[in-house]
Amino acid sequence: MSPKTVFSTDTHREPIPPQPHPSGARPPQLPRELIPRHVAIVMDGNGRWAKQRGLPRTEGHKAGESSLFDVIEGALELGVPYLSAYAFSTENWKRSPDEVRFLMGFNRDVIRRRRDELHARGVRVRWAGRPGRLWKSVIKELTEAEELTKHNTKLTLQFCVNYGGRAEIADAAAALARDVAAGRLSPNRVTEATLARYLYHPDIPDVDLFIRSSGEQRLSNFLLWQSSYAEFVFLDTLWPDFDRRHFWQACEIYARRDRRYGGAEPNPVGPPQSAAGAQGQD
């Protein structure tokens, strides 16, 4: 591991510009209206990457860290405002105890090690997921990163740890039901937009582009509500081999899609408000 770079935590300084890719590759020149506002990524293929090299699965997870942070640089270069990364799902508890322990410590250490770097780049960190079962040290690092970066506006990175799409919808429904039971909300006034306000981060807009690496073609319970009108791009590249050039490739594919939202003609405005839920800037 290379020595840690020390970044200033001065919130009044201009963010450090993204670092160019070593290959010299530049982001595609897309019209602003064709740049996805919110990109969700399932970072898949770490285990297979390690197996191909005769390495333990944990080495694949370690190698995937640099891929995520190169993609973050690419999102900053392209001007994508929101990026969601699936770091640990509610189903990942089914893995071996050794791998779960590694992933808990690894997620904690990545946030701790990279927090100042993200802050210096103008990235705002948001955590989405259930606190139950998570190590307290993981929660501590995530909440401290959220506090440090809360005023940043270049990119919002939603770090999904102990997250499940069904769990989020169930938690939202339970919170809504409590408000109905307490008389704060009439059941006759509940709409899709009402439920959307109870999601973990209702201010983060719905997913425009959903990317999955490794060639697998499934959602794996990730941002189910928010991805109802997303465009899906599945790339064969294993996650540790993935970088911003693959991210840009997916964004170019997205830009060529006609988004109809159930209508007969392409609709640049977006889905009906009742389906989209509560969307808005931070």
Swiss-Prot record:
Mg(2+) binds at residues 44, 231. Keywords: Magnesium, Metal-binding, Transferase. CDD domains: Cis_IPPS. PANTHER family: DEHYDRODOLICHYL DIPHOSPHATE SYNTHASE 2 (PTHR10291:SF0), DEHYDRODOLICHYL DIPHOSPHATE SYNTHASE FAMILY MEMBER (PTHR10291). This is Trans,polycis-polyprenyl diphosphate synthase ((2Z,6E)-farnesyl diphosphate specific). Binds 2 magnesium ions per subunit. HAMAP family: ISPT. GO terms for biological process: polyprenol biosynthetic process. One of its GO terms (cellular component) is cytosol. It catalyses: (2Z,6E)-farnesyl diphosphate + 10 isopentenyl diphosphate = di-trans,deca-cis-tridecaprenyl diphosphate + 10 diphosphate; (2Z,6E)-farnesyl diphosphate + 11 isopentenyl diphosphate = di-trans,undeca-cis-tetradecaprenyl diphosphate + 11 diphosphate; (2Z,6E)-farnesyl diphosphate + 9 isopentenyl diphosphate = di-trans,nona-cis-dodecaprenyl diphosphate + 9 diphosphate. Catalyzes the synthesis of Z,E-mixed prenyl diphosphates by a condensation of isopentenyl diphosphate to an allylic diphosphate. It shows a large substrate specificity accepting dimethylallyl diphosphate (DMAPP), GPP, E,Efarnesyl diphosphate (FPP), E,E,E-geranylgeranyl diphosphate (GGPP), neryl diphosphate (Z-GPP), and (2Z,6E)-farnesyl diphosphate (Z,E-FPP) as allylic substrates. The enzyme exhibits the highest activity when Z,E-FPP is employed as an allylic substrate. Its cofactor is Mg(2+). Belongs to the UPP synthase family. Coiled coil: none annotated. The active site is at residues 44, 92. GO terms for molecular function: ditrans,polycis-undecaprenyl-diphosphate synthase [(2E,6E)-farnesyl-diphosphate specific] activity; magnesium ion binding; manganese ion binding; prenyltransferase activity; Z-farnesyl diphosphate synthase activity. Homodimer. Residues 1-30, 262-282 are annotated as: Disordered. Pfam families: Prenyltransf. Substrate binds at residues 45-49, 57, 61, 89-91, 93, 95, 212, 218-220. The lineage of its organism: Bacteria, Bacillati, Actinomycetota, Actinomycetes, Streptosporangiales.
